[in-house]
């Protein structure tokens, strides 16, 4: 009897210990779209209302240009930027459309990794990874520091695809290693934007371009190549996603009209879906069981589909006859630049100023509603089971109630240009604008969260 009681107490303690470790890991925001890489948060504790006069804890000017997302580990915030002598900043959607083609750089940029204190935004250190002149021009709306860094809690890994540089820096700002993986021309001259992810000592890099595409795994300890897989895909801007399903773990890489699942350990192709129409800008969403993904071209909306762990080998996406492993598919429902997100039983997709809600189990569209007076949306969504957050480029964030009915709970405004995907940690919301990094946090004396 005593043994049974002891075992029960031991298991209870073990569960509490594991949960505490899990919650600590989830409290940090170590990569693009958070710890699970899909924008999901267990419970969002940052304020639901903010402005320049409400719940704005601090703002910090950031030199140069960069659409990379900030990442958070403990009290440290990391982000990258590329700085020239003119302190060049990106243009918004309208400005980019008017100018279209960017000018080829005529001078070198400082490619920097910055570390800030999350409490007050003060600068801990700034490290110049390299000073180099990019070989290719980019779209005026893009930057030379659009790829988000990632951390394992000991080092920060950053990737500047425009110059082909990958580097590891410790938490004191010391360069540990750096390697060159090559710089290549991009489709339509837009530039690059695929962020990093890592797992089990491997750093994964997606480099889809118009010359020599590949996905690469580097050893986090020294930057040496573990495996490299050549790809037929042309330019794509989606980021690699680690999908831990009931059968295996896949490194999911979305390319131009294709989605491929690689074995993260070896680089072997586990499965491949073709006929997905065009290049992917958005990254996958997930509910922990399935992944949800899609794309859209500049003139029309592309497919939206769900993939289950039964997917295997190579198959062609066919809406009329779904191949094995495709749970459901819609001909026209894909996202624009903003990655979709799962909240509860629903999948949310943003495209062309509309928010669409789908049943994640069947793909049935529940609603499609216009976001009032919204501008272009590039930043990916984030959500818990009760709220969905979307931020347009003008700094307006819509807080939408999760569920079958479209209901905007709040609209929050900051004055800057925003394309970067936010970061969330321990009641803090970090929003990167073109000019400043903003920290939203409950300020005592504010009545509403």
Feature names for model-found ranges:
Residues 25-449:
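Noncatalytic, solvent-exposed loop/strand surfaces
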């Amino acid at each position: 009897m005593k043994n049974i009681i002891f075992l029960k107490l031991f298991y209870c303690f073990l569960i509490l210990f594991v949960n505490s470790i899990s919650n600590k890991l989830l409290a940090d925001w170590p990569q693009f779209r958070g710890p699970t890489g899909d924008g999901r948060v267990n419970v969002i504790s940052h304020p639901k209302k903010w402005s320049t006069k409400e719940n704005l804890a601090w703002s910090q000017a950031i030199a140069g240009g960069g659409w990379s997302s900030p990442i958070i580990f403990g009290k440290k915030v990391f982000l990258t930027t590329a700085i020239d002598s003119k302190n060049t900043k990106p243009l918004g959607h309208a400005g980019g459309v008017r100018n279209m083609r960017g000018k080829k750089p005529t001078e070198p940029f400082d490619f920097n990794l910055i570390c800030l204190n999350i409490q007050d935004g003060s600068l801990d250190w700034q490290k110049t990874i390299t000073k180099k002149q990019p070989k290719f021009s980019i779209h005026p709306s893009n930057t030379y520091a659009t790829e988000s860094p990632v951390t394992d809690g000991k080092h920060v890994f950053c990737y500047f695809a425009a110059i082909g540089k990958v580097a590891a820096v410790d938490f004191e700002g010391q360069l540990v290693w750096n390697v060159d993986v090559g710089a290549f021309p991009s489709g339509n001259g837009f530039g690059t934007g695929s962020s990093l992810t890592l797992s089990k000592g491997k750093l994964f890099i997606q480099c889809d371009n118009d010359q020599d595409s590949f996905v690469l795994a580097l050893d986090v300890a020294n930057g040496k190549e573990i495996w490299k897989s050549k790809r037929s895909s042309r330019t794509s801007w989606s980021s690699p996603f680690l999908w831990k399903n009931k059968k295996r773990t896949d490194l999911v890489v979305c390319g131009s009209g294709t989605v491929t699942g690689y074995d993260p350990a070896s680089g072997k192709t586990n499965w491949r879906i073709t006929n997905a129409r065009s290049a992917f800008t958005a990254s996958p969403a997930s509910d922990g069981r399935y992944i949800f993904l899609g794309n859209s071209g500049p003139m029309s909306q592309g497919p939206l589909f769900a993939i289950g762990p039964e997917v295997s080998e190579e198959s062609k996406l066919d809406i009329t006859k779904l191949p094995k492993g495709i749970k459901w598919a819609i001909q026209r429902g894909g996202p624009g630049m903003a990655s979709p997100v799962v909240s509860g039983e629903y999948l949310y997709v943003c495209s062309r100023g509309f928010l669409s809600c789908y049943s994640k189990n069947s793909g049935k569209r529940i609603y499609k509603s216009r976001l009032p007076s919204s501008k272009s949306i590039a930043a990916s969504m984030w959500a818990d089971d009760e709220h969905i957050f979307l931020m347009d480029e003008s700094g307006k964030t819509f807080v939408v109630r999760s569920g079958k009915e479209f209901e905007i709970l709040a609209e929050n405004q900051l004055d800057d240009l925003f394309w970067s995907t936010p970061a969330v940690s321990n009641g803090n919301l970090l929003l990167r604008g073109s000019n400043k990094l903003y920290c939203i946090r409950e300020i005592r004396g504010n009545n509403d969260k």
